[in-house]
Amino acid sequence: MADEINEIREEQEQLAPFDPSKKKKKKKVVIQEPVEDLAESSQTEKSDSLPVNDGLESSFTGMKKKKKKPTESSLLNNESVDAGEDLDEIANDEQEGEEGIVLQQRYPWEGSERDYIYDELLGRVFNILRENNPELAGDRRRTVMRPPQVLREGTKKTVFVNFMDLCKTMHRQPDHVMQYLLAELGTSGSLDGQQRLVVKGRFAPKNFEGILRRYITDYVICLGCKSPDTILSKENRLFFLRCEKCGSQRSVAPIKTGFVARVSRRKT
């Protein structure tokens, strides 16, 4: 009977009106941690509170610190830098050496306070001439003249065989050369059919050679550069000698004939 009464009461309580003011109380659940977990948590809190350096020193008090070896990249960079500096120094030394050699060859007085020597200054002038005008400063071309070939024709005439060849070598007109020869020899002559100069009188080859030397000096050679490449022209009754190399121009004296004895008989 008592059990039935209790069941009825419980049903009545369940069917009772809902009261929102009343709240159910939550039961507090207490979890007990083991002792080992508590010790570990306390150690972590202490380690967090300590600075990093102190923790490392306290943990590794009995051990020595090892020095770190330099990496291979740093070594390679240092070697490349040293090699580059060495190459730059070698290149600079070579350039300085070459410049010093060139200056020493051109100007021996560089780097000293001594007086100039005439031979050194003269060599410098010729070096400048060779650089600017290699034709003028080069070796002079010597004009080689063939010796005159002279033959006797009879007892009163002399034949100049290679007269035309010498005129071509000197680049002069045969009439002008013949006029000078006859004026210097003091005789008369003419060209024959073989283009040989036939002169009246007896003359040795030395006579023709000396006259030709004077003709070359007066009417062929340039007095400035001593070049035989000249042109003889006539302007306003005057002869001018112009050099094709240096461009200088000068007037030359006209050919003067001396006294010529009249050998032919006068007509009566």
Swiss-Prot record:
Q: Which residues carry this modification: Phosphoserine?
A: 42, 80, 112
Where are the disulfide bridges? none
Q: Give the region (Disordered) as residue ranges.
A: 1-85
Q: Keyword rRNA-binding, does the record have it? A: no
Q: Which UniProt keywords apply?
A: Acetylation, Cytoplasm, Initiation factor, Metal-binding, Phosphoprotein, Protein biosynthesis, Zinc, Zinc-finger
Gene Ontology MF term list: translation initiation factor activity; zinc ion binding
Single GO cellular component term: eukaryotic translation initiation factor 2 complex
Which portions of the chain have biased composition (kind: Basic and acidic residues)?
A: 1-12
Assembly state and interactors? Eukaryotic translation initiation factor 2 eIF2 is a heterotrimeric complex composed of an alpha, a beta and a gamma subunit.
Q: Which family does it belong to?
A: Belongs to the eIF-2-beta/eIF-5 family.
Q: What is this protein called?
A: Eukaryotic translation initiation factor 2 subunit beta
Organism the protein comes from: Arabidopsis thaliana (Mouse-ear cress)
